[in-house]
A protein has these predicted regions:
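N-terminal targeting signals for Sec/Tat export/insertion, comprising classic cleavable signal peptides
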Residues: 21-50
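A generic structural motif
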Residues: 58-65
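Short, low-order "capping/linker" segments at domain edges
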Residues: 95-116
Length: 116
């Protein structure tokens, strides 16, 4: 009986959500304007304490309160401003509304940024 109680206690502890959970999400973009838009969308998500997007690696590094948000919610919010993530693609009409400089789906735009 004691062994069962110990297992239940350990299981509950393992599922405890963290207030300062570090996670990274891959987000498509090409420039500093993209960076600003992506970070703003992430930071406007309830429970996000820190967000920084790296132009070269396309990784959005986050510190989140898992009691208030999750990565899927953040991905939805980032896609809502026009940026694809690994899990969620931005709607075409939203993507088409971003600045021409930020059209990360266009190989010519991506190549032009690689030359910088």
């Amino acid at each position: 009986l004691m062994f069962c109680l110990l297992l239940v206690g350990l299981s509950a502890e393992a599922q405890k959500k963290k207030k300062n959970f570090k996670v990274a999400i891959e987000v498509d973009g090409v420039c500093m304007m993209c960076k600003k838009r992506i970070e703003k969308a992430a930071l406007n998500s309830k429970g996000v304490k820190f967000a920084t997007w790296d132009v070269k690696t396309h990784l959005l590094s986050l510190i989140i309160d898992e009691n208030k948000t999750d990565t899927k919610t953040i991905q939805k919010n980032v896609a809502a401003v026009g940026h694809d993530t690994k899990g969620i693609k931005a709607k075409d009409h939203v993507y088409n509304g971003i600045n021409p400089c930020c059209k990360y789906r266009d190989k010519k735009v991506v190549d032009a940024h690689d030359d910088l």
